[in-house]
């Protein structure tokens, strides 16, 4: 039996890899622990790792980088693939053809890459945990991380 799969978008991944003990960071870390304890399979997509990692590197936040590395090793990690990137290109083009782009034309669109990574798993019980459902929910199931419950 396949359990529910939750992919972490950059928002929640950034919260759980932030060593600062803010209320939101601690709440997100506790939420992640509850998911794991209930049997939810939590995955770090490579595009989300990239988005969080580049900012941690820019700001020279070594403790955050260490936490991010630990998470990437402790959880399942979904590397980018040629198939996912080609699907992302199709999603990007389709969004523009329908007059609803998800990012400006000259940026790498992390949302469509994340959506394509999620689609590449080809499973029915999957959701992306995010802090901004908007663009993602056009392509794949996405919810605010605060609304995703552990398995019962």
Report each predicted region and the residues it spans:
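A generic structural signal for short hydrophobic patches within well-formed alpha-helices
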Residues: 13, 49-52, 85, 136
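Short acidic-hydrophobic, aromatic-tinged amphipathic segments that line or gate anion-handling sites
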Residues: 76-81, 144-151
